[in-house]
Curated annotation (Swiss-Prot):
Gene3D superfamilies: D-Amino Acid Oxidase, subunit A, domain 2, FAD/NAD(P)-binding domain
Protein family (similarity comment): Belongs to the DAMOX/DASOX family.
Major localisation: cytoplasm
Protein name: D-amino-acid oxidase
Disulphide bonds in the chain: none
Residues that, per the record, bind D-proline: R359
Uses in industry and biotechnology: Has potential use as a glyphosate-resistance transgene in crop production; can metabolize the herbicide glyphosate to yield AMPA and glyoxylate and confers glyphosate resistance to A.thaliana.
Keywords, ordered alphabetically: Cell wall, Cytoplasm, FAD, Flavoprotein, Oxidoreductase, Secreted
Record-listed FAD binding positions: A12, G13, A14, V15, G47, G64, I65, K225, A226, R359, G385, G388, L389
Lineage: Bacteria, Pseudomonadati, Pseudomonadota, Alphaproteobacteria, Hyphomicrobiales
Gene: dao
Domain of life: Bacteria
Amino acid sequence: MPEGRHVAIIGAGAVGVISAIEALREGHRVTLIDPGEPGGEQAASYGNAGWLSSHSVIPPAEPGIWKKVPGYLMDPLGPLAIRWSYLPKALPWLIKYLLSGWTEARVEKTAFALRDLLKDAPLLHRKLAEEAGVPELIERNGVMHAFPSRGNFDNDLGWRLRKKVGVAWLELNADEMRQREPDLHPRYSFGVVVEEAGRCRDPGAYVAALANHALASGAKLVRAKATGLKLSGNKLVAVVTETGEIACDAAVVAAGARSKQLTASVGDPLPLETERGYHVMIENPETGPRSSIMASDAKMVVNWTNKGLRAAGTVEIAGLEAAPNWKRAEILRDHLFSMFPKLPRDIPASRIKTWFGHRPSMPDGLPCIGHARASRDIVYAFGHGHVGLVGSARTGRLVAQLLSGKQPEIPLAPFSPTRFL
């Protein structure tokens, strides 16, 4: 592959801006294309929980999850909810989702692939933050998982597989939990701390800083919505936008949940779906955790950010266009109050902020990282689901390696877009 190509990167989220930085490092010219502000409220990265969980190697679907589907359909406020009106459209994706976690062997295969992608992610993000002049936004201080009992932990397939792929952790009994987290509800009597993991103090500000760093390093930003990719034979000639064409030698599709239309325009109808996520944030709370915590029973991450105490999590399958169900954010708020009983229940509404966005998700829990079938000038980098922020650092490196014709630093076969084609 020739060096010094003009690369158009569609999407200025975490994956897109880091891909831009790494492509510039390889000597390419870069144009970022996005209608929104990098790191703005419209972006999935903005509302991210802020966990840099290099141990998040377990896909959402696990053996036996099919038994829970009726409950997901009946409970619009559960950890995973499926809107009836969207079910016909989501059904093909849901079937692939269930099959991907049908056996433990399949889940284990996914875990090994994700471990390759996520290993050392907090360190990679720290280096990027230092380059961008915002080292204070990335902390590598470990994260805690809280369980009601040791039995809940022992019966969790995910932790057996994490051990298998090389994740280490520190185990805490009830007394040690109280010492570390005195304000956490005493119903949590067992915990594990994954010391290799970290957190981002402000995901939106981090992505904005990375975008500014890319621009300062020579990238350009075009505020437009990309609608397609223009080929001449097997050669890419332009990215098509609502305001015109942008000539380029190569393109990266990193448009998150809106990547599906772009891949279809070049003959790759990929099964990308949006897992809608919510967060609630309390500004200047009176109490809270000392560290970042995931509550196993609530399926919710609680993390301190520069803007306040943020609780994020759960999944809603309802597509890109449906209005948000803000009761799901209220459930997160109630879980937060339950986890930390000393939080006042009369916090003014003006101090409680809610948000919702779209996780771009492939049914098997693995992103698409690789070339389009129609042209090796097109690189796909989307579909990270729950590991978009943490996985973006290595994904950007892989994108730059693919653009330059270099050997990728990890095996990319598990992430190949052709696995569903």
